[in-house]
């Protein structure tokens, strides 16, 4: 019990110190609000205002705490200042070859009826990937060099039905710009197949990228136009390697690569494919990183 109590106080002290740093230049009520939100999320493991409020254990009615936090959220206008402090507080912990991850997710509001600009989204948490009401989320993180922990540098909740909406690519490019601004140097961007888009590829050409391809993608294989998926099925992986997963599962896979050309910009890239991750389909990746040997393939 003593160790548990000590750990709790240590966690709270670290959260308070962090909040103090990212609150530089804002007034005391907003600083208190930031501390309450950060500690409430950490202690409750939830982003619901009601759960955050309960974990603050204030000597007032729960309703009053909820109303205070909601009021502060509605009137909060120090986002740019806090974000700047946040980036400065984290510092440069990304190493000489930083890796950024980009992901589109969703927030499902299954029972929501009156939320503003409710959109149709694919519920990624459901097994059948059903369509529900909710919002899209665009996120970019940079991995720390040593611990490989993700540090969020861009997070945007949006709806395709809002008046301000232009395109999903607009938010993706803003998330890429956020990484560029934070790092100020060349990095490797990792994207899932939802980002298999010529505009994204062109936008990332000044940096390194690794993008998972969809099965419909067509490339030039030695001048001839061919479907990437059909072509990869004909080729065997030449490099054997073992992958470890979080549940201590080991899987032996076979990896190889080949040069391809994109028809739309006539630029050469490396196509890396992996057999064995799924019994049904190989994993297909496109990258602008140069591959000269086995180590380069494994690195991708």
Predicted regions: what they are:
Residues 1-35, 42-43, 85, 96, ...:
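Single, function-defining residue in the core of a domain
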Residues 3, 21-79, 144:
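Short, positively charged, Gly/Tyr-enriched micro-motifs
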Residues 44, 61, 132, 277-278:
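Generic detector of ordered secondary-structure context
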Residues 50, 135-138, 170-174:
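Short, contiguous clusters of charged residues that form electrostatic/catalytic patches at enzyme active sites
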Residues 66-147:
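Active-site-proximal, Lys/Arg-enriched surface segment
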């Amino acid at each position: 019990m003593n160790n548990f109590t000590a750990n709790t106080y240590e966690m709270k002290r670290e959260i308070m110190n962090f909040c103090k740093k990212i609150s530089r230049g804002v007034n005391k009520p907003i600083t208190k609000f930031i501390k309450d939100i950060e500690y409430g999320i950490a202690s409750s493991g939830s982003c619901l205002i009601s759960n955050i409020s309960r974990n603050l254990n204030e000597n007032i009615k729960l309703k009053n705490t909820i109303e205070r936090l909601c009021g502060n959220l509605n009137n909060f206008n120090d986002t740019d200042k806090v974000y700047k402090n946040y980036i400065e507080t984290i510092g440069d912990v990304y190493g000489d070859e930083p890796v950024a991850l980009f992901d589109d997710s969703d927030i499902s509001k299954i029972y929501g009826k009156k939320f503003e600009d409710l959109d149709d989204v694919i519920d990624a948490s459901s097994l059948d990937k059903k369509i529900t009401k909710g919002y899209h989320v665009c996120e970019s993180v940079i991995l720390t060099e040593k611990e490989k922990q993700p540090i969020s540098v861009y997070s945007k909740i949006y709806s395709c039905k809002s008046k301000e909406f232009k395109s999903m690519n607009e938010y993706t490019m803003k998330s890429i710009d956020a990484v560029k601004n934070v790092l100020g140097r060349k990095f490797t961007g990792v994207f899932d197949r939802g980002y298999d888009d010529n505009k994204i590829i062109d936008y990332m050409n000044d940096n390194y990228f690794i993008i998972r391809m969809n099965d419909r993608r067509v490339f030039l294989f030695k001048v001839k136009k061919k479907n990437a998926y059909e072509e990869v099925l004909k080729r065997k992986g030449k490099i054997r390697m073992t992958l470890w997963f979080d549940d201590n599962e080991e899987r032996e896979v076979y990896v190889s690569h080949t040069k391809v050309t994109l028809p739309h910009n006539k630029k050469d890239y490396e196509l890396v494919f992996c057999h064995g991750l799924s019994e049904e389909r190989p994993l297909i990746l496109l990258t602008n990183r140069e591959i000269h040997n086995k180590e380069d393939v494994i690195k991708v």
